[in-house]
Amino acid sequence: MADYWRKQQPGQPLYGDILWSRPERRDQAGRLTIIGGNSHGFSAVASAYQLARQLGVGEVRAVIPDALGAKLPTAVRHQLDDLILAPSNPSGGLALGAERDLAVAADWSNNLLFIGDNGANAETAKLLERFLTNQAHQGARVTLARDTIDLLVYSAEALLARENCHLVLSLAQLQKLARAVYYPRVITFSQGVKQIAETLHKFTISYQIVITLFHDDNLLVAGEGEV
């Protein structure tokens, strides 16, 4: 096995010291803001919120379009301890006017999860690009998932150059990003986990992001050339 590739054994933590040092008190377990949803979809935000609470995140906040807020059942609202309704556009997604809410969220938690369900919305794509490339927010740690990646393909160069950025994506989305930046290595679905691991090794040397990718029944996490 290549020296950059560390493989976890079944039933054993790969980094035991991190696992055992998790905070036991909720007030010491950090803050997380979950961002996403549109007037026709909320499941990704709701699922991520519930999972974050189950895993012991100290404080969790959700930012969703105000067009969606009116459609939330009362029972769902009561499950969300901290809910921000940000400006939405006519299509029901987050509007450019939501940038202030994202900035406040970044100041509050410094950990932002863009969970998706954005819809194929050009204005939301512009909002995300503007926020993620704004130098004032470069210190915020961001995780991008699901259709958030698709919205930002045309901003791939700036996205991959961002510090503190974690992409949770599919192999198809990795292909799109690689093509968008003219990455010289071919990525195909027929490649085995060893070839994909080598690609992630080289890709995360070229770009300072962290990538999480599920392929061929293996979950791979890569950053700074380590897989």
Protein language model features and the residues they cover:
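Positively charged, low-complexity intrinsically disordered leader regions
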Residues: 1-27
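Glycine-rich phosphate/dinucleotide-binding loop and adjoining beta-alpha-beta core of small-molecule
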Residues: 5-6, 65-227
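Short, contiguous strand/loop micro-motifs
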Residues: 10, 34-36, 186-187
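Generic signal for short, ordered secondary-structure residues
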Residues: 11, 30-31, 152-154
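Generic, low-specificity signal for short hydrophobic/alpha-helical stretches with a mild N-terminal bias
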Residues: 14-17, 34, 113, 159
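Short secondary-structure boundary/capping elements
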Residues: 15-16, 40-44, 93-98
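Well-ordered alpha-helical segments embedded in enzymatic catalytic cores
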Residues: 19, 44-47, 101, 127
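Substrate-binding N-lobe of the ribokinase-like
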Residues: 21-87
